[in-house]
Structure formats: structure tokens, C-alpha cells
Amino acid sequence: MKQYLELMQKVLDEGTQKNDRTGTGTLSIFGHQMRFNLQEGFPLVTTKRCHLRSIIHELLWFLQGDTNIAYLHENNVTIWDEWADENGDLGPVYGKQWRAWPTPDGRHIDQITTVLNQLKNDPDSRRIIVSAWNVGELDKMALAPCHAFFQFYVADGKLSCQLYQRSCDVFLGLPFNIASYALLVHMMAQQCDLEVGDFVWTGGDTHLYSNHMDQTHLQLSREPRSLPKLIIKRKPESIFDYRFEDFEIEGYDPHPGIKAPVAI
């Protein structure tokens, strides 16, 4: 994961001081890309421990179309707590847009099922895309989508994916985002009888918060370790039938975790 550390250093070296919605302040760059060959290992940051339980359960929660944090709480995941209302609701965030994008005539589009069908029946299509950026519902969301738009691509029997992330918290959020979409590529590839290819991450406003600087320097002082391997123990009937127990990360030997405040 040297690419991730190189991005951190780039933001420190080249970033512009900016104000932000949270009032915290950031160092920010605009436009950056990283490519991870998923054949070479699972891209889980090793210079600090990442909470894999949260990453897996959040993705399963998205795929169910859920937008209430009850499921996350049942599985000891608290990463969305700060944005939920008193009933645990977040509004029409990722899961709603992925699974039930509303149309003007009252129907709903299941984008995940749509892209799966495209991958199986028209893998050369240039329209195998999922968007969470629904302009008509942004004002109803507790938090506008940060990882907003992703596209799948099939070549030589391998499935690749590119994500556009409009806003990226490099220290806290990005390790989760990389691992989450890498996991999704593995799951989609298994469902479509494909090998995994590359995960390409593209960032817009890519920033380090001003209260993450000490943590960033600590992480940069650590040497990356070998990437772990993802094992999926079974092939469920559909992309929506995976369970937490289906996944195993083999050989994950990270440095200790580093705590940092969340900008809300």
C-alpha cells in the first residue's frame, strides 16, 4: 500500500489550506488516481489496523438497500452513528440509491441487479455504472455521497472497477473505501465467474483534516507490510446473499491502530 502513503505525503507537500463544511479545516489537493492489481493481494492498509468487521458489514448493509443503522448496531458497527437521526435513519443514502433509485413514473431501479445482468450478458458495455449521486434527493440525505459513482470493466476474463470519490478523508475514510470496493469487485467477479482485475480509485477533493496531522506523520513513519489475501468461503445464490462469515482475510499483520477524531 505504498500508493496510499505516497498520497498522504503528496497532500502534505502540495496541499492547499481550505475551509470545509465541518469547520475543521483541511490540506487539500484536487484530482488523484491510484490503481490496485487485486491479483497481487487484498488492498487493506497495513500501516495501521483497519476494522474489517465495519468494512464488511457496511458493504453488506449497502447491498441490502438499508439506510437505518439498526443492522450496523446489531453487528457492533458504529461508523454511521454521528449522522443518524433519533430513529437511526439516514435518509436515501447509498443503499437506497444502489437498490431503489426512484424514477419520475414511480418505479424504482435496482442498479446492482442491473449491472450484474450487464456483466453477464453484455460485458463489453461501456454503461456498466452505479451512481449514488441523486441530485433530486441530496437534500434528504444525512450525508451526501462521498464515493459517488463507479464503473465496471471486463477484459481477458477479469473484472475491474473504477470509483470516483468526490470528497476523500485520506486518513480515516480512504482505507475503508479502498477495501470496501475491492471486496465488492471480488464478490461481483465470483457471481459472474470472472477473475479479479484492477481496482482504480479516482479522487476529487482529496484531503487531510487539520486535526489528523500527528496521526498522518506517525503512519508515514511506519513501513508497509505484505498485503493479505481475501478468501470467500462459498458462492451464494446471489450478490445479496453473502454473510459476514463468508469472508476471511488471511495473512493480515498490520501495525497498531491509530485513533483520530471524525469530522462531522
Curated annotation (Swiss-Prot):
InterPro entries: Thymidate_synth/dCMP_Mease, Thymidate_synth/dCMP_Mease_dom, Thymidate_synth/dCMP_Mease_sf, Thymidylate_synthase, Thymidylate_synthase_AS. Signal peptide: none annotated. It catalyses: dUMP + (6R)-5,10-methylene-5,6,7,8-tetrahydrofolate = 7,8-dihydrofolate + dTMP. Keywords: Cytoplasm, Methyltransferase, Nucleotide biosynthesis, Transferase. Pathway: Pyrimidine metabolism; dTTP biosynthesis. Its EC number is 2.1.1.45. It is found in: Cytoplasm. Belongs to the thymidylate synthase family. Bacterial-type ThyA subfamily. This is Thymidylate synthase. It comes from Escherichia fergusonii (strain ATCC 35469 / DSM 13698 / CCUG 18766 / IAM 14443 / JCM 21226 / LMG 7866 / NBRC 102419 / NCTC 12128 / CDC 0568-73).
